[in-house]
A protein has these predicted regions:
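Nucleic-acid substrate recognition interfaces
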Residues: 1-184
Length: 184
């Protein structure tokens, strides 16, 4: 069998977090800011298309986000990780792409009560399995219940809160194992 040299296996792991009360407050802020930025970017993209008949890319929206964060009325956006906010913009942009390419539903504005509270990070995340903790930007080291460990490069970490109020970290790992060709 031959290996596909450019593709490797991606595995997902989910851990239940045990944050301190201060970390819970910071996570709630991050959930709210990410939801706000998603809705802001969706609104801006729709209005720009309706008014100027042009589409804003995720890069354009991230540049606009930098300006928004400097506005006196939006300084509170600086209290959370910029990476999470940019990931919200990328998620919204991805929803638009799927709408046009795959004919899925038109992207909807996020609601605090209807939608799941999540935020994503791509860089600067570290796991310490000896002490059962994960380092999340701005939030710091958060304890978690470790039922298994992993080896490989961390891709994306998604922090979420369930409807029961429990916090989880889902992490995608590139374990470096090549994907095998299909057997015929």
């Amino acid at each position: 069998m031959y290996h596909k040299a450019d593709k490797t296996m991606i595995k997902g792991y989910k851990y239940r977090l045990n944050p301190t009360p201060e970390q819970i407050v910071q996570m709630e802020k991050t959930f709210g800011c990410c939801r706000y930025v998603y809705n802001w970017a969706l609104d801006l993209k729709i209005k720009t298309y309706q008014g100027e008949k042009r589409s804003l890319s995720a890069v354009d929206l991230c540049k606009q986000l930098t300006l928004l964060k400097k506005d006196d009325n939006h300084l509170w956006l600086n209290e959370v990780s910029n990476e999470c906010l940019q990931q919200s913009i990328r998620c919204m942009d991805s929803a638009f792409t799927k709408f046009f390419r795959e004919h899925t539903g038109f992207p909807k504005f996020k609601s605090k009560h209807r939608d799941k509270n999540v935020f994503k990070n791509v860089n600067s995340v570290k796991f310490d399995f000896e002490n059962n903790r994960v380092k999340i930007p701005i939030i710091g080291w958060v304890k978690f219940f470790a039922n298994r460990s992993f080896d490989g490069k961390i891709g994306t970490i998604t922090v979420s809160r369930s409807s029961t109020g429990k916090f989880y970290a889902s992490v995608l790992i590139d374990d470096g194992i090549p994907i095998l060709d299909d057997i015929q």
